[in-house]
C-alpha cells in the first residue's frame, strides 16, 4: 500500500515516466495503424487468387499512358471489354453494354469553378464507357453502382489513378457472376474522368442509370497506401460503412469538409453521381501527392497490399449492400472517423451541434457550482492574478519563440514540408513545451501554487470554450457541412472533464482533510476525531509490539522518546498550529489537490518513496463510531490525493492522440500542395504551427512538474528536429519537386513550338533549363498571380505524324479552321437579332479540342459576361439546312436535339468554353454552330457602353490536344518519342525533379479566328 501511494504521488519522476509511457503508446498505435495493412494479405485461397488476377490486370492496363486523347486509351477499352465478356460469359444473370458500340453521346454544362460566376463550360462527349450488370434476385431493392475510370493523364500510367479501382471492380464482378446478389449491381468502367468527369456524366444517358440509387466510387489521388473513405452522402451511408467494413476501416469526415469548402482543388466522379441524386461512398488513395499524375504512377511505386486494402474495402461494402436492406432514413450530414483502424465512429452533424450546445452550457455550469461551493466554504484564498496570469504569460512567450522559428524556416527552407512535415511539427511542439516548462517551473519555484495544473486546466478549458462557440456557430452556418470540426468538441470535452475532476477533488478534499488550517471550514471536532483515530491505531500497534519484544513500560517510554526527538518522521504527524500558520502565510492558497502531507513539505525527488517513521501515541482512547467515520474519511482523502493521475489520463493521452491523428491526416493529404501555389504554402505552414500548438495543449498544465531530465529530452528533440528542418533538402528522388509540362504549336505565330514549364518558383526551373542541351534562351514570368511561375522556351518540335515532319509549314496541314457561315455583317439580320455562325475545325488524328470565347467586353472569365448563348454540335447534315429551333424536342437542362439530329445547348448566363471530345480518330473534323447576342442589347444594362460592328465580333481561340508521348518515332534516323522536348527534360533533369502534364495532352496546337 505504501509503495502504491509512493508510485502514484504527484512527483516529477512519476509524471515524467507516465508522460514517456503515454507518448510511446501513442506512437506505437500510430505506427501499427499506419503500416498494419502491409501484413494483411489474404490467406484464403479464393481471396489470394482474386488479388493475383487483379494485380495481373493492373500490370496489363498500365503498360502505357492512356489518356482519352491517345490511341492507347482504345487499347485499354478493348482489353476491359474483352475481360468483362470473359467474366460474364457463362453467367445467366449478367450482361454487358458498350457505349462505344451504342454511339452514346451527351452535351452538358459544367459550372465555372474558377471564377465562381454563372458562366459555364459546355462539354460535348462521345462515350466509351464499358458497363456490366448483375441482376439481383430482389427487384424491389434499389440498384448499387460501382464506378472507376480507366483513363489516365497524358504523363501518367494510371496505376493508382485509377487502375486499382478498375481492377478491384473486375475482381468484384468476377465474384458476383458466380454468386447472384439480392440487389442489382451495375459496374461502370468509365472513360475521360481526368478532364471534365465526362464518363460519369455520360452514365446518366444510359438506361441502366434509372435502376440505381447507391454508388461506390473508387478513385486515386495519391500513389498507394491505404484507401480512405473520402466522403459519404449522409449518416445512413456512414453507418452502412461502419457495419460493413469490419476489417481495417479508414475514413475521416475532415476530408469531406475539405470537398464541401473547396479546399481540395480536384473533384472525383462522386460529385457527378451525388448531383444526380445518388447516395454512396467515395473511396480513394490520397498520398503521396507528388507522385500523383506522374510517370511514377506505375506498379513499381505501389504494392499488392495497397491494392488489397482498396479491393477488400470495396468488397466488404458491396457484400453488405448486396444482401441487406439497411435503414437509409437519416439523410443528414455525417461526422465520422476510425479509431486505431479497428472501430468506425459515426455521428450526425446536427447531433454534434446539439452536443456542442449542451457541453458549452453544462461544463461551465459544473465548474461554477464547484467554485460557489468552495467560496461558501471559504476555500478561495489565493492571489488571483498570480494564479491566473502565469499560464497566459508563459504561453505568449513560448509562442513568440515558436513563431520566430516558423519565420526562420519560411526564409531558409520553406518547402521542407513537401518532403517531411513531421519534423517541423515536432520541432515547434517540443520547443513550445520546453519553453513553457522553463517558465512555469521557474515561476513555481519562486511563488509556489499547490495545484497549478488545475488552474491551468480551467484556463485551457475557458479558451477552448470560447473557440468551441465559434466552431459551433460555423457548423450551423455551414448548413452542417463543416463535418471536420469534431476534434474541437473532443478536445474541449476531455480538458473540461480534467478541470472538473481537479476542482471537485480539491474542494471535497479540503473539506475532508483536517490536517491543515489553511483549509478554512474544518471543525475542531474533526481534528480531535482524527487524533483519536491515530491514538487508537497507535495503541494497537504498541500492544502488539510490546507482546513480542519487551515490557510495556519500556516500549511506551521508547515510543514517547522517539516522538519527542523525531516528530517529523511520523506518517500521520499533525503539525503544530504555529507551523500550520507559517506554511499558510508562505504559500498562496487555492482550492487544490495535495497529498495527505501537502501544505507542510512538498514532495521532491529527495523525498523518500516510503516513509519509515514511527507512529506517534495519543493518550486518549477513541470510540468505535468515531474511528470508523474517520477511517472512511482517511480513505476518501487518500483517493482524492491522486487526482493528478486521473486528470493526466483523461486529458493528455486522448487529446494528444486525436490531435495528432487529425493533424497527420490533414498534412499527409495537403503538405505537397505547397508546390502548387502560395495559398497552399500558407495553408500548410499555418496548419503546422496551429497543429503543433494544439498538440502541446494537453501537456501544458503539467509542464511545471516535469523532471529536468524530461525537460532536457524536449530540448534535445527541439534542437534536433529544428536543425533538420532548416538544413534538410526539400526535394529528393523519393519526394521530388513536380513541374508541369505543355508544348504548344501556335499557328498564328509562324508555327512556333513553345515549351511551357509551370512550377512554384522560377528559381527551381532556371537551373534545370540551364542544363538542357537544346535550350539556348528562355523566359520566366509570374503566372496566375498565386506564386506559380511559368518558363517558356523554343523546344524541339513534336513528331506526332510521320507524314508531316519535314517543315514547320506542314503544321498548317494538321489543323485548319473554316468559317462556314457568319451573319454578323449580313443585311438580312436586324441589329437586335442574335448573331449566328458555323465553324469547321479540320484536325488530324485528334480526339480533343477546346474553344474559348472572347469579345471587346468579355475576355474569358476575367471580365464581363460572355455574349455566347447557344452552341450546336453539327453532325453529318449540310450546314445550310440546319435551323436551330427550341420546339423540335423538349429541352432538358438547356439541352435539346433538332429534327436533323444536331445537339444544342443553350445557357442564357453566358457560355465561356466549349470542350469537344470525339472517339473516331479518322473523322478529321468538328462542325459547330454558335449563337451570341449583339452588344446593342447590353445598353440596357450599362448606358455608358457604346456599340459598333467591331464590338459584336466574337473571338474564338481553338486549341486541340494530343495525349500520347511514349510512342516510338524516328527523327533524323534516330529513335525518339513523339515529344522529344519532354523526353529531353526527363533525361537531363536532376533526380529530384518529376514532370506532370498541364493540360489534356502533352502537345497542343492553337489557332485564333474572329467571327
From Swiss-Prot:
Residues 568-578 have a biased composition (Polar residues). The chain crosses the membrane at residues 15-35, 353-373, 391-411, 421-441, 452-472, 488-508, 648-668, 682-702, 709-729. Its EC number is 3.4.-.-. Its cofactor is Zn(2+). The record marks 292 as: Transition state stabilizer. CDD domains: M28_Fxna_like. It is a multi-pass membrane protein. GO terms for biological process: proteolysis. InterPro entries: Fxna-like_M28_dom, M28_fam, Peptidase_M28, PFF1_C, PFF1_TM. GO terms for molecular function: metal ion binding; metalloexopeptidase activity. PANTHER family: METALLOPEPTIDASE M28 FAMILY MEMBER (PTHR12147), VACUOLAR MEMBRANE PROTEASE (PTHR12147:SF58). Signal peptide: none annotated. This is Vacuolar membrane protease. Residues 1-14, 374-390, 442-451, 509-647, 703-708 are cytoplasmic. Residues 534-585 are annotated as: Disordered. Zn(2+) 1 binds at residues 149, 161, 219. It is found in: Vacuole membrane. Residues 36-352, 412-420, 473-487, 669-681, 730-1011 are vacuolar.
